[in-house]
Amino acid sequence: MNQFDLKNRTALITGGAQGFGFDITKKFLNSGANVIIWDIDEKKLQNSIKKINNSKLSYNVADVSNFEKINQTVLEINKKTNIDILINNAGITGPTAELWNYSINDWNKVIEINLNGTFNCCKAVVPNMIENNYGRIVNISSVAGKDGNANASAYSSSKAAVLALTKTLGKELAGKNIAVKAVTPSGAKTRILDQMTDKHVKFMLSKVPRGRFLELQELSSLVCWLSSEENSFSTAAVFDISGGRSTY
């Protein structure tokens, strides 16, 4: 896979200890970036650090649903370096159930992490980007946010809202050298599939014309390009990577 020039850039990747986030982390490091990964699970963060073994990689234990704490963490980071790139990747699927059987607590938890977490991280990081007149933000949404997945109302709704947030923030920052994009991957073989029933996984795969799940490196390459200085004109846009499932 080709590399993009991210030298002298610092990237913050939420949910960076596993799945999409872990693969994006490796891609960014190979492209020369300094990378800070966030996750709520410190053991997974420490394991990621050991696996990669790169001096340009560091971590913070962070709950993206808690604005006060992550804002304080960002302020501490900004004392040492600017955050040039923000990848909002942290997310959960929640249970598989019809809307009328979906618990209020489960609904709120999915929205808190997937939507509010994205809002919180943008709110904390953007002021420093504005001050430096540079930034790249990529929000990891989902094809479910475009098409809606049956029995996944909270997840689909949260990811649809992330697309609206991306378009809004992108327009608000369009007059500055800060670009905001979202990507809408279809299902990939990550731990998030373990939260779903086999029936639901087979249903997801049946809707992908390419007939397979997304490879992690395919997404990380797209995210890396979107995060590079080369990608300077596009903003408030959604980039599809669903194997033909969604064509808009």
PLM ranges: what are they?
Residues 142:
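Residue(s) in the substrate-gating loop at a strand-loop-helix junction
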Residues 122, 158, 166:
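Active-site helix of classical SDR
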Residues 2, 93-96, 147, 224, ...:
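Short C-terminal tail/terminal secondary-structure segment
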